From Swiss-Prot:
It comes from Leptothrix cholodnii (strain ATCC 51168 / LMG 8142 / SP-6). It is found in: Cytoplasm. GO terms for molecular function: nickel cation binding. Disulfide bonds: none annotated. InterPro entries: UreD. GO terms for cellular component: cytoplasm. Belongs to the UreD family. UreD, UreF and UreG form a complex that acts as a GTP-hydrolysis-dependent molecular chaperone, activating the urease apoprotein by helping to assemble the nickel containing metallocenter of UreC. The UreE protein probably delivers the nickel. The keyword Chaperone applies. This is Urease accessory protein UreD. Its main location: cytoplasm. Required for maturation of urease via the functional incorporation of the urease nickel metallocenter.
């Protein structure tokens, strides 16, 4: 039996209380687990959960986000998103977000794991209006090699789109040794992390430079210094990429850079989501 889960989240700013008010509607097993305000009323932390625990062939999960002017949402998950083996059907996740002027979004799900023989598609689209800004990450692990469960069969299609700013579409096949093992590709690593900060306008030159400088300093102090890098591929965004043998060191690096960028760009404390500590 396949599942179709659809979650709609709408955020608006209440100026009387300086509060981000959230409304949600869901169909199927995808829903909000927690709504928290650990930083005060202006920033809403949402924890999304898919109760069946994983996505199998034939399943489709859709998330639609709408951020009104002045709202600020942080969205994460309590655990990894897991694509399990498929008998031939595609498992899909689609995330679509619209950020109005003056809104902020932090898209910070925990890692995605592609299990052996999965056939998966993951599509992320973030429309950012002038005056809005977001930071987000995507962390993909191919199999669980440390547990003796390598990714030997299957495919994974990843699309990440910031219209007018950045479009990336990559199809990864488990049989593509040239991509996965070449020093010009994954270099034998099995975890790829991407972290970005983007605005609806060109980032001020001083801000872009400060973000890159801080990330390079943290990369230089990391065990992943040889497989991580940061650049500004477009005037509106700064992007970091990292390859790692396991999820933990990649997530540690992304978390450190997220804390630095949050302070530099928004003058906010790191505020690690509580669900990550449980």
């Amino acid at each position: 039996m396949s599942w179709h889960g659809h979650l709609q989240l709408h955020y608006r700013h209440d100026p009387n209380e300086d509060r981000t008010v959230a409304h949600d509607r869901h169909h199927g097993p995808l829903r909000v687990l927690q709504r928290l305000y650990p930083e005060g009323p202006s920033i809403c932390h949402h924890v999304l959960v898919h109760p069946p625990g994983g996505i199998v062939g034939g399943d489709t999960l859709e998330v639609d986000l709408d951020l009104a002017p002045g709202s600020h949402a942080l969205i994460t998950t309590p655990g990894a998103t897991r694509y399990y083996r498929s008998a031939g059907e595609v498992a899909r996740q689609q995330v679509r977000a619209r950020l109005a002027e003056g809104s902020r979004l932090e898209w910070l799900p925990l890692e995605t794991i592609a299990y052996d023989a999965c056939i998966a598609e993951n599509s992320l689209r973030f429309e950012i209006a002038p005056g809005a800004m977001m930071m987000g990450w995507d962390l993909l692990a191919l199999g669980l090699p440390a547990a003796g469960k390598p990714w030997q069969r299957g495919s994974y299609l990843q699309q990440l789109e910031l219209p007018g700013i950045w479009l990336e579409r990559a199809r990864i096949d488990a049989a593509d040794a040239r991509l996965l093992d070449s020093p010009l590709g994954w270099a034998g690593q099995r975890v790829l992390g991407t972290f970005w900060l983007a605005g609806g306008d060109a980032l001020p030159k001083g801000l872009s430079d400060a973000l890159i400088e801080s990330a390079r300093a943290l990369i230089g102090d990391s065990a992943l210094a040889a497989t991580a890098g940061v650049s500004a591929p477009h005037a509106n965004t700064v992007v970091l990429r990292v390859l790692a043998p396991r999820v933990e060191p990649a997530m540690h690096l992304l978390g450190a850079i997220r804390a630095a960028w949050r302070s530099i760009a928004w003058h906010l404390d790191p505020c690690v989501p509580r669900i990550w500590r449980t």
